[in-house]
Amino acid sequence: IEKIYSNGYEKSMIVQDYIPGDDSHMRVLTCYSDQNGKVKMQCLGHVLLEEHTPKGIGNHAAIITEYDEEVMTKFKNFLEAINYTGYSNFDIKYDARDNKYKVFEINLRQGRSNYYVTSSGNNIAKFVVEDRVYNKELPLKIQKEPFFWRCIPKQVVYKYVKNPDLVKKCKELDAAGKSATSFGYKADLKGNFKRSSYVSLYYINQFRKFKKYCK
């Protein structure tokens, strides 16, 4: 902090407690609140791995959706109490020191890893169109079934996720067809050599990046 201020920074700083735990202690919650401030969709994700490159650190790379009624109800009540409308995306971390979840921030948008929401059956584009364009009264949709999403090769997930129970769950979901990758859209890949080559190189590169940066 002294070095920061001695180099010309003059404004206030917020000092935040470091919460211990690897990537799998992270959670991400995506919600949609309609034009009347009522929550109409919630999808909670248990983060398995994040990116570890200097530029990408903190971005979610693999997620399993999960249902936690207590946590999701608290956020629903908060959003409705402030009459929030639109997308909201919360970064949360489980603190093993007191067995509580700590909220880092609310993003007033969908997250970079939002395909974990769409691929698990919650098309957020449909929610906003039906709410804002067609003025429909939407039912509350809460994601309860587990679904495995990733934007990296599943072999990377299996290798670098430290919790064997989570790895086992990933493999079970994948075997059951309850998994998806952001780079697996068949219409993009079929007959498209350039796109297929890019995706293949991207995946190969992920093995190299995790080997170098994920310690």
Feature locations, PLM:
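ATP-dependent carboxylate/phosphate-activation module, predominantly the ATP-grasp catalytic core
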Residues: D17-N83, N107-R132
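A short glycine-rich, hydrophobically flanked beta-strand micro-motif that places a catalytic Asp/Glu
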Residues: V15-D17, T85-R97
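Peripheral (often C-terminal) accessory segments that flank ATP-dependent C-N-forming ligase machineries
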Residues: E130-K215
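Conserved ATP-binding module of the ATP-grasp superfamily
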Residues: I1-D22, P54
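Pre-DFG segment of protein kinase catalytic domains
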Residues: V103-E105
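Conserved protein kinase catalytic/activation segment
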Residues: N99-Y101
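Short acidic alpha-helical/loop segments enriched in Asp/Glu that coordinate divalent cations
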Residues: D91, Y116-T118, K141
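Short, basic and Ser/Thr-rich N-terminal targeting/leader segments
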Residues: Y9-K11, D23-R27, G86-S88
